[in-house]
Design a protein with these regions (language model features):
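Helix-to-loop junction immediately C-terminal to a conserved catalytic motif
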Residues: 59
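P-loop NTP-binding/switch modules centered on Walker-like glycine-rich loops
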Residues: 181, 185, 189-266
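Short catalytic/signature loops enriched in Gly
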Residues: 3, 17, 24, 236-330
Length: 330
């Protein structure tokens, strides 16, 4: 598969004050990732794992501390944010945010919201072609034409979500980053929007980076899954492999926590202990060690590298070559 996005040694550290001295919060730490052309990749992990920071880095909404983001071989991080915003590459990466209510301009009608990126990124002027493009995009996402003259507060949650998706796909991006796009919606509406997203990817041949805490949704929509913990990638695998044979203890706990009536009564992995602080963490220790039920002394002295444990399957655990993802030694 031809790479569309290549992330190389990407880091984002935030300077903070701790005990009266300077320190750094490691939101994303030395991440490598590739997203192929037409591929749908899921990004999962608990709150604070770095998912949202990755969204902002890939969308060039913030600058990295170190590392590169390449789009079709072009280094986006070599540009200032202002230069990127006016570059031809800007239209190739679009983001659909968690809450359309927050991301839509309240003074823009739905028509204006969809037209805005066409003006800014494609240089289209008001006229017949603009009108045709907006209406065609609205139809593509299932937004009735009569709703195009309404303001966001006059639309339902599902309708606002469709407007947010429409304004992102209107410029025909190569990569659509979806940051928890359905989490603010009712369950019944979520299902409809998820079907829409699956249909759009098939029809428009876009790549997806789907960020979610809902593993069932990720399993449904994504061909490959990336698991993050405290700024680090701990596992990457084809979706079915990750859900049926996870190798990292953290991934095993996430998968075991998915509600499943067939496993009722079974013992599930528990994550006890104290999480490692993301503030200046020990570079020589596994970030997950404080909560890991299968850690050993080596985990405190050697950061486990992300290494192959199977076909297209990688895990950052010293014991991941074991099919059970660890050892019981402590």
């Amino acid at each position: 598969m031809t790479p569309l996005i290549e992330v190389r040694s990407l880091s984002k550290f935030y300077p903070i004050k701790r005990a009266g001295r300077g320190a750094r919060l490691h939101a994303v730490d030395d991440v490598d990732l590739t997203i192929g052309t037409g591929e749908s990749v899921g990004l999962v992990g608990e709150s604070g794992c770095g998912k949202s920071t990755m969204v902002r880095l890939l969308g060039r909404l913030i600058d990295p501390t170190a590392g590169q983001v390449l789009l079709g071989g072009e280094d986006l991080t070599a540009m200032t944010q202002a230069k990127f915003a006016s570059s031809a590459s800007r239209r190739r990466i679009q983001v659909v945010f968690q809450d359309a209510t927050e991301s839509l301009n309240p003074s823009f009608r739905a028509f204006q919201a969809i037209a805005d990126p066409l003006k800014r990124l494609l240089g289209m002027n008001n006229g017949a072609e603009m009108d045709r493009r907006v209406r065609a995009t609205a139809a593509l996402v299932g937004l009735p034409e009569e709703l195009l003259q309404r303001y966001p507060h006059q639309l339902s949650g599902g309708q606002r979500a469709r407007v947010g998706i429409a304004r992102a796909v209107a410029v025909e991006p190569s990569l659509l980053i979806l940051d928890e796009p359905t989490s603010a919606l009712d369950v019944s509406v979520q299902a409809v929007i998820l079907r829409l997203l699956a249909d759009l990817r098939a029809r428009l041949a876009m790549s997806y980076l789907f960020v979610s805490h809902d593993l069932n949704v990720v399993r449904l929509l994504c061909s490959r899954v990336v698991v993050m913990y405290l700024g680090k990638i701990v596992e990457i695998a084809p979706a079915e492999m990750l859900f049926t044979a996870p190798r990292h203890p953290y991934t095993q706990a996430l998968v075991a926590a998915i509600p499943d009536p067939a496993r009722r009564g079974e013992a599930r992995p528990r994550l006890d202990g104290s999480p490692t602080s993301p503030i200046d963490p020990d570079p020589n220790a596994c970030r997950f060690y404080g909560r890991c039920p299968k850690g050993a002394d080596i985990c405190t002295t050697a950061m486990p590298p992300l290494r192959a444990v199977g076909p297209d399957h990688f895990a950052a655990c010293h014991f991941a070559l074991s099919p059970h993802g660890g050892t019981d030694e402590r």
